[in-house]
């Protein structure tokens, strides 16, 4: 059996996992959506644990036992500047992920810009 490639696209709205062969032909695709949270006006957050579970779920649905031994490569893309702070002792997120669309830092950016930065 030929070598297989997994591609994971963890985007703003979902985790997408794709399985390709060596000729870059897509063999399977899985899409698992996640919630977006808006705790305040202009704020956008994701549950980092949900995203982690969705990545695990998408890979499990994508690969079958018969192809697991033929995995050759893994490619990952993610959501631009989305940030998650993890507890170094527990491995758990301290708070929700701050999504790249979130505007909570806009005032700080505007102040820096006005100061010449």
Where are the language model's segments positioned?
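N-terminal glycine/serine-rich phosphate-binding loop of ATP-dependent small-molecule kinases
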Residues: 1-95
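Glycine-rich phosphate-binding loop and adjoining helix at the ATP-binding site
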Residues: 56, 84-117
